Amino acid sequence: FTDVASDAWYYNVVSQAYVKGLISGISDIEFSPESSVTGAQLIMMLYRADDNTVSEQTSGNWYDEAVDWAKEKSIISDNNGWTFDANADLTREQMMVLLYNYLQYKGNELSALDDLSSYTDRSEISAYAENAVKALVGKGIIEGDGETLRPLSSLTRAETAVILINAVDSVNPSANQGGMQ
C-alpha cells in the first residue's frame, strides 16, 4: 500500500493481516491506516477470520451476509449493551465486546484480569464492556496506550490490524475451528 510506510509502527501487522485475508485496503493501493473502522468493517474482518468467503452481493448491503453470520453466532447480540450500527464508527470498547464475543464463539477460554488499576481511564469503561475489556487485556490482545485504554475513542484501521493479529497469535490453537490459526 502506498500509504503504509515501511518504517510505520503498524507496517508488519498490516502486512500480516492483509496476507492472512483479515483486512483489505480501501483500494488496490491504499490502506488508509488512520481512518476509523465501522461496525460493518470489523464484522467483515471477523467473518473472513472465520474462513468465510464473501459472496457476490446482488442486492442489499455489501456487509449483510457477514452481519447475519455475526448475529447467528451471537457476536452481535441485543445483550451487547449498545445498539450495533453497521455504518457507525466503532469505539474501542465496542470493538472489544465484538472481538470477545467472537473469541468465545470460537471456543477460547478468556479469563478476566482482576483489575485495570494500571489504566488511568478505567472509569470511562462502560459497564457492558468491562468483562470484555478485562479479558482481552488479561489475554494480552489489548495492550492499551501507555497508561490508557481509550475505551470511548474511535478505532483506526492500523489499530484494528494490530488487535486482529494479536488475537490470531494468542488464541488457543486446539480451540480453533477455522480461520484464527
Regions found by a protein language model. Give the residues of each.
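Feature responds to low-complexity, polar/acidic, surface-exposed segments characteristic
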Residues: 1-11, 24-93, 99-130, 143-154, ...
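Tandem repeat domain/solenoid detector
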Residues: 19-21, 138-140
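Catalytic cores of secreted/periplasmic or lumenal enzymes
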Residues: 133
